Regions:
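N-terminal secretory signal peptides that target proteins for export/translocation
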Residues: 1-2
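Sec-dependent N-terminal signal peptides
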Residues: 5-13
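C-terminal segment of classical bacterial N-terminal signal peptides
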Residues: 13-21
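Function-determining sites in protein domains
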Residues: 22-217
């Protein structure tokens, strides 16, 4: 989770970097990012509290999206007693700014426990849930997708992917930006979110088929 301290100076670089984000290779890092700075830990704590739906024990597929300027969100799949559910939970605004984490002004400090998220959920077939989980598995188990990126980006989204669909399966990775393979997960993750909000199922199926073709499934 990257510092926003210098956001003002990098804002003008956003559009130039965005065009280059879809790099020629992925730079996934295994597990979840190890946070050390106090402001990073506070931001992460707020995200996990406000968007707590994304970390419930029934979640078997997850994509956490932490943008530099827009609202944080989590899209995923939950395995419930009634079957599978696609969901999206999103903050009402960028929590970094909502909570005044980058400000020394005490008047801007807010209690994240009072912030209410937006939440959408919708049933999903087991077959489609399994296909989506297979996409996450393909990307997260391919060692070629793990590579240390020497650059430091403060103007792009950070994504964390997780899948625990199969017995004893627990795969997690994070990345700043995206590459040709993790980009497919972004498109499917956003299609899942749209499905949860009522978009036609065919749109999600189309996104899954396209990702399967790109990833060779």
């Amino acid at each position: 989770m990257l510092s926003r301290i210098a956001i003002a100076t990098v804002f003008l670089l956003f559009f130039a970097r965005s065009a280059a984000n879809a790099a020629d290779r992925d730079h996934l890092q295994r597990g979840e990012e190890k946070l050390t700075a106090d402001f990073e830990i506070k931001h992460d704590r707020a995200i996990r509290h406000v968007l707590s739906r994304g970390w419930r024990q029934d979640v078997v597929v997850r994509m956490v999206d932490i943008p530099a300027f827009e609202a944080e969100s989590v899209a995923g799949i939950a395995r419930t007693a009634n079957g599978y559910t696609a969901f999206e939970t999103a903050a009402p605004g960028n929590l970094w700014y909502e909570l005044g984490l980058g400000s020394d002004d005490p008047k801007r400090k807010k209690d994240y426990r009072r912030i209410k998220p937006r939440l959408h959920e919708r049933s999903l077939s087991e077959a489609l849930a399994a296909r989506i989980a297979a996409l996450w598995r393909r990307v997260l188990t391919d060692p070629r997708n793990y590579w240390k990126d020497p650059a430091l980006y403060m103007d792009t989204n950070q994504f964390t992917y997780h899948v625990s669909f199969l017995p004893h399966e627990r795969l997690t990775a994070y990345v700043d930006g995206w590459g040709p393979h993790s980009e497919q997960l972004i498109w499917v993750g956003r299609a899942m979110a749209n499905h949860a909000k009522g978009a036609p199922e065919k749109d999600l199926i189309k996104a899954v088929k396209k990702a399967e073709a790109k990833l060779g499934i």
